């Protein structure tokens, strides 16, 4: 089972929006050195909606090849087209990804039965472990615990990223899940609480800029070292809060560029962080110790 701090890694881009693949390789090496336990490539934070299919595949390929099995690579291959998700997932399997991340279909607003059939079709078509991804704040389609538990009966559906931020709902899911089905937080602000209640890790935005701290937090919380987890989380809280002052990944990319981790590029309709928030994010970085 994949567990711990799983970074939802950014896609480095130059000022003109071109992919920075050497920069991605450097980021991967840095994450491994800092203790990151796994990487989600081309997820929400990786700007999956604004990369082409060819770029999407290239990012997965580069991540898998460069990581070389040092840590697991989870390929973001989900979408609101079942057939396209199958094609991307097949590519991820072919190049050696360890698992796929399958987001609830967005915009077309499927029913619970539609969600079930969508995911079932993908995992039947491609023999690659799949992690479901429920993020109703972005998809406007909320997968119920009942549907998640129904899908959890399929052996290749190995877990869910719960980005609802609803701790009581997550606890109820964990109470009813099969023993080998993983639950990951997808919300940095509530991740510690969910892990202390039994979640297997955090698929994290904050880990992009504080990988060692997030690894330490996950290790402490998963292993029930409560006081240690609280102390680490308290240090990271300013980042949990201010990295979402505008929609992710805008504040995150600004913060990472500020300390030289990546260039400042992103793609429309995402635009750079408003100047009025620069000092606010910078202060959070200082408070959390990622900026001196």
UniProtKB/Swiss-Prot annotation:
The active site is at residues 133, 161. Its EC number is 4.3.3.7. GO terms for cellular component: cytosol. Disulfide bonds: none annotated. Pfam families: DHDPS (PF00701). Pyruvate binds at residues 45, 203. It comes from the Bacteria. Pathway: Amino-acid biosynthesis; L-lysine biosynthesis via DAP pathway; (S)-tetrahydrodipicolinate from L-aspartate: step 3/4. It catalyses: L-aspartate 4-semialdehyde + pyruvate = (2S,4S)-4-hydroxy-2,3,4,5-tetrahydrodipicolinate + H2O + H(+). It is an enzyme of class 4 (lyase). Keywords: Amino-acid biosynthesis, Cytoplasm, Diaminopimelate biosynthesis, Lyase, Lysine biosynthesis, Schiff base. The record marks 44, 107 as: Part of a proton relay during catalysis. PANTHER family: 4-HYDROXY-2-OXOGLUTARATE ALDOLASE, MITOCHONDRIAL (PTHR12128:SF66), DIHYDRODIPICOLINATE SYNTHASE (PTHR12128). HAMAP family: DapA (MF_00418). Homotetramer; dimer of dimers. Catalyzes the condensation of (S)-aspartate-beta-semialdehyde [(S)-ASA] and pyruvate to 4-hydroxy-tetrahydrodipicolinate (HTPA). This is 4-hydroxy-tetrahydrodipicolinate synthase. It comes from Herminiimonas arsenicoxydans. The gene is dapA.
